[in-house]
């Protein structure tokens, strides 16, 4: 399978990596009135793109760069590289519910990617953490094994940052799906800039990677976990 087809699989919402049960915070935003329609959805998507979207994309690209380099060097320090990458993701996710969700998504992605592109790297990921490595590390590993570039992997990450909440908003608010996807597409120039910034940062020290978050969304994520009735996991 070509790298392009692999990226299309990884970016497809039907790829069984668990993303369909998450709203990327939209369920909380709808409940507390931050997202009520198309205009506020666009604001939310832009905010997510420039905060968590940038952070995750940089972590994904950094994972591709470092895992590729370690494979070229013979995998002698692979376990340490995975642990270091995973720790950088952990440090950038403050709320326990979001940390748990990221590990579940990473574990699921590792499992399905191992079936699609069998490679010993996935066994190393599974051995690195009992609950699974964080999703950006797993996505980076899947990109490496399938032959995708840091730019391609970061683009998939940004695609998810936009489309996960956009599609959840359709379900929660009954928005016009054509309008919702058009909003996401209209942000393409900004998304391209985020990908470029993420990949540029990924070539530097891990400690200097972006660490942008949305504090209000993080607080809402903790509250969301206490709800008795909810449609999405996050």
Residue spans for each PLM region:
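Short, contiguous, pocket-lining structural segments
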Residues: 13-17, 21, 33, 51-52, ...
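Internal, conserved structured core segments that host functional sites
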Residues: 69, 74, 78-147
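Generic structural signal for hydrophobic core residues of well-folded globular domains
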Residues: 28-33, 48, 52, 63-68, ...
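C-terminal auxiliary extensions adjacent to catalytic cores
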Residues: 34, 38-39, 43, 144, ...
């Amino acid at each position: 399978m070509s790298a392009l087809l692999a990226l299309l699989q990884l970016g497809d919402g039907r790829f069984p990596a668990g993303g369909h049960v998450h709203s990327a915070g939209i369920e909380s935003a709808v409940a507390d009135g931050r997202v009520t329609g198309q205009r506020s959805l666009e604001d939310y998507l832009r905010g997510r793109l420039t905060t968590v979207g940038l952070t995750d994309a940089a972590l994904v690209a950094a994972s591709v760069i470092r895992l590729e380099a370690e494979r070229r060097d013979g995998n002698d320090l692979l376990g340490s590289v995975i642990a270091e990458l995973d720790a950088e993701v952990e440090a950038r996710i403050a709320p326990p519910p979001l940390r748990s969700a990221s590990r579940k998504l990473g574990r699921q992605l590792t499992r399905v990617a191992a079936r699609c592109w069998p490679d010993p790297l996935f066994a190393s990921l599974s051995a690195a953490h009992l609950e699974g490595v964080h999703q950006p590390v797993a996505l980076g590993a899947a990109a490496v094994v399938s032959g995708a570039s840091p730019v391609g992997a970061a683009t998939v990450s940004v695609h998810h940052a936009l489309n996960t909440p956009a599609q959840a908003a359709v379900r929660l608010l009954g928005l016009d799906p054509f309008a919702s996807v058009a909003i996401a597409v209209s942000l393409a120039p900004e998304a391209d800039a985020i990908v470029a910034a993420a990949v540029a940062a990924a070539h530097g020290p891990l400690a200097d990677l972006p660490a942008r978050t949305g504090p209000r969304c993080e607080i809402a994520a903790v509250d969301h976990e206490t709800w008795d009735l909810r449609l999405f996991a996050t």
